[in-house]
């Protein structure tokens, strides 16, 4: 089994209940789930996004063990999002649930359909902070400026 981290967010409907329902569904396909704190965050939007999309998100991070490969995991996550009523027409529009694969242990993948670690991870301070709460010793696997820095070390930069 492989340790993974997922980022969850909701900014439509009963956001807290949406996160709880998603975690319940994920618990049927994952093992040993640990849940971070839940934070309220501003929506990330493009400058030309409609103003009505500017709805705060509730976000959390979970870690778990998975016996699926990354592609299978992504397929299962997309099924859960659809079951919960997520309809994606445009990027960054409001959503009932958003589940992202942040990490798949120390794996580095960059394909058209899947990038692990998540492409936006280092640009989402809330995700790094929540990750550090529950998997502080995870090491960034991508060569470059942050290579082999732990989630704890990456989160420390937020305090400066």
Regions found by a protein language model. Name each.
Residues 8-10, 66, 132:
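Short, structured patches in soluble enzyme cores that scaffold and shape functional sites
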Residues 1-30, 35-43:
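N-terminal beta1-alpha1 ligand-phosphate binding loop
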Residues 26, 44-58, 68-75, 79-160:
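Flexible, gly/pro- and Lys/Arg-enriched active-site loops
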